[in-house]
């Protein structure tokens, strides 16, 4: 990358910067915000899928398949990623999949459950995201991301 940093170092700086911004908010408020965020995200994902069928999305938007599993859980398969397209157009492909891993940190800090085994940033065919309003999510980059991309 242009800054002459190793890819892992870039990702770790991105994670640290975002973690510091997010943790300014007290933990109790973060957990409350997490529930609200997931509820809103669930509604927006369903509407996004409808807009997608009508071809009303910006070229840098996400292409998704949305599935409601239960009141607590929903899944989104992302088949086209706006961030990946943008990173590519600005010759910043090396930011991925490091930025993809942010989902784990944000879910962990907000007290939501999150799982994923594939990402477009890792070269997979989709990002297979599973969100839980109530649940656990580990943020442990030191353990690596094999099996939880």
Predicted regions mapped to residue ranges:
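Short terminal or interdomain "cap/linker" segment that borders an active site or interface and mediates
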Residues: 61, 65-96, 104-149
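Amphipathic interaction/junction segments at domain boundaries or subunit interfaces
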Residues: 1-90
